[in-house]
A protein has these predicted regions:
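N-terminal membrane-anchoring alpha-helices
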Residues: 1-42
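Mobile, glycine- and charge-enriched loop segments
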Residues: 27, 31-60, 158-188
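Membrane-embedded segments
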Residues: 42-140
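Conserved acidic residues
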Residues: 78, 85, 179-181, 200
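Binuclear metal-dependent hydrolase catalytic cores centered on His/Asp/Glu-rich metal-binding motifs
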Residues: 130-137, 148-185, 191-193, 197, ...
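Conserved beta-sheet core of the metallophosphoesterase superfamily
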Residues: 188-265, 272
Length: 272
């Protein structure tokens, strides 16, 4: 009986260490390939580093966030994107003012671009948008062209689904559907908003991959989205478009992760 009790306590201890420390703080770099007829040979192998849901603040201190950004930079990605929820607390300016100088250290060959998430708005709606625009790296409600030789693709970003404007057709106006179009959005539910312009790939976060996933069944019992299909990895929206959901880095509500480690997603474009 004592031996059984010892093993039960040991298992619970190891699970606790895994949930509270290992999976939360040991950020993995996971590659995902996206293949499309619109990816030209010039962009074959093009790597996009996805930074989502940092949630700087309680239990995610400044030195750790800086370490994460340095690790992303060490990947020497072609492009880096921030998908929002950079802070945790509501109704405070402090975390926003501290995290943005760190975010601006994010580097890639073709630059780093950002959109905001709901937590950024909840901290201070006006200030979060002001800091985003002042960073010089905002892609909120706009688009840019990324070029390689004579090839190009469109990178666009939309405001948060819960707290900002989401007008996909407007931000893609003036672009052409023959070109690859990648849209950044914090919340994957944004992809289900009505739009006529074709999007080839949405890059999103928000769900933390469910944060807690049931082993063997590979699902999360709690997801902060309308469409329960949007948990982690590549999914399809109701228009048949590809949506990628990153597991992200931080946590919400409970400071744990279970079978869902913190992650920097690396999207690798592939031509046919």
């Amino acid at each position: 009986m004592r031996k059984l009790k010892f093993y039960v306590i040991l298992i619970l201890f190891l699970v606790g260490v895994n949930c509270f420390i290992i999976e939360r703080y040991w950020v993995r770099f996971q590659e995902y390939e996206f293949k499309s007829d619109k990816v030209t040979k010039d962009f074959d192998g093009y790597k996009i580093a996805v930074v989502s849901d940092l949630h700087y603040g309680f239990l995610n201190p400044e030195f750790w966030v800086r370490w994460v950004i340095k690790r992303v930079n060490s990947q020497n990605a072609d492009l880096a994107v921030g998908l929002g929820d950079y802070v945790k607390k509501r109704n405070t300016d402090v975390e926003l003012l501290k995290v943005w100088p760190i975010l601006k250290e994010l580097k890639a060959k073709d630059g780093a671009y950002f959109v905001n998430g709901n937590h950024d708005h909840w901290a201070n709606d006006k200030l979060s948008l002001e800091l985003l625009e002042k960073s010089g790296r905002s892609i909120r409600n706009k688009n840019i062209v990324i070029r390689r030789n004579i090839s190009k693709f469109i990178l666009a970003g939309i405001g948060d689904f819960w707290e900002d404007r989401t007008d996909i057709d407007k931000i893609l106006s003036g672009t052409f559907s023959k070109d690859l179009r990648i849209v950044l959005s914090h919340n994957p539910d944004s992809s289900n908003t009505k739009h006529k312009e074709k999007v080839d790939l949405f890059l999103t976060g928000h769900t933390h991959g469910g944060q807690v996933r049931i082993p063997f069944f590979n699902f999360s019992p709690v997801l902060p989205v309308k469409d329960s299909n949007f948990d982690i990895g590549f999914k399809k929206n109701k228009f048949g478009e590809d949506v990628f959901i990153s597991a992200g880095i931080g946590w919400s509500i409970l400071p744990i992760r279970f079978f869902c480690p913190s992650e920097i997603s690396l999207i690798v474009l592939r031509s046919p």
